[in-house]
Amino acid sequence: MSRPVLPRSPLPSGTPTRARTGARTGLRARARTPLAAALAGYVATRLIGLGVLAIVAAATGKDGLHRLKGRWDSVWYVRIAEHGYGYEVTLPNGDVHSDLAFFPLFPALERGLSAVLPVDAATAGLVVAWSAGLAAAWGIYRCGAFVGGERVGVLLAVLWGVYPTAFVQSMAYTETLFTALAAWSLYAVLRGRWIAAGVLCAAAGLTRPTAVALIAAVGIAAVVTVVRERRVSPRMVAGVLVAPLGWLAYVAYVGVREKSPTAYFDVQAAWGNSIDGGVALARFIAGLPWAASLGLCAALALLGRLVVLCVRQGQPRSASSSSPWSEPRTSVRGRG
């Protein structure tokens, strides 16, 4: 009599097989490819810009590197990094421009980096700006890929590198640092990681005054999530409360330093920056030649139309169940 053949006992569910391991490796490789394309595309746009700058600098006999790290706002940030706050310039018309108009995170990074690397604060500013540019492109890619797929993510990252004033991304300015913090904060919102979103938003609030828009976005996203899920997560509440702390802390610091609760806004007003409900924009458009004015109005109208279309289509929307922007029937657990 032949012996019965016993069936093989199945591997435990947690034991990886060669096929399973290979599949995971393939998935990771495929996930890295679009990200590499996004970052490579962004770097290419910046290298083209730097190449043009080098050609112009050589033709005019000027120092191109100095234009990147030693002009306009860059000078103010370097002075803060090296000497702290307290510098003012009085204009011929009597207006006073104070360095308190500039937020502290970027010069703090310049100061810290120049302390550990053999570079001055101005060069450290370029290192921060260029590194943050890559981080921003990565974050923009993640947001786009989460909402619309990998192709959308790649296109968004590259387009950010070629928008009309993208040249400042190559300078020792705060645009790249702020954009990186904003992009990753919004990505954290999309993933339901509210505490991470709040912390990144708070850091953005120490970088630029435009963080108020990011603070509003985090708050609105939380409200939408509460309406859709009909519950409030403690992590969501914590993230929303943390989000404005950076911006509020600096505004309070300026107020205490200058002994006036409106000191920060007074400083900004002296620089010609204020919220006027669009009056300054209307005056700017009215002062343009008619062709330029017409083109700008058409662009603004198209932008408004695009916003309407996005709202009608329910954008942004993702199929991921971890997103607060999923269909209302999807249950989401907020995470930090």
Identify what each model region corresponds to.
Residues W72-G86, D95-P118:
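Short hydrophobic/aromatic helix or loop-helix immediately within or flanking a transmembrane segment
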Residues G112, V127-V147, G304-V308:
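Transmembrane-helix motifs of polytopic, lipid-linked glycan transferases
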Residues G161, A182-Y187, I195-A222, V242-L245:
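Membrane-interface alpha helices of multi-pass inner-membrane proteins
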Residues D120-T123, I140-V162, A180:
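Transmembrane-helix signature of polytopic, membrane-embedded enzymes
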Residues T45-T60, G64, K69, I215-V224, ...:
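Membrane-lumen/periplasm interface segments of specific transmembrane helices
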Residues V147, V154-T165, Q169-M171, W184-L190, ...:
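Transmembrane and membrane-interface helices of multi-pass
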Residues P104, A108, V116-A135, A292-S293:
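Loop-to-helix entry region of an early transmembrane alpha helix in multi-pass inner-membrane enzymes
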Residues M171-L177:
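Short acidic/glycine- and proline-prone juxtamembrane loop motifs at membrane-interface regions
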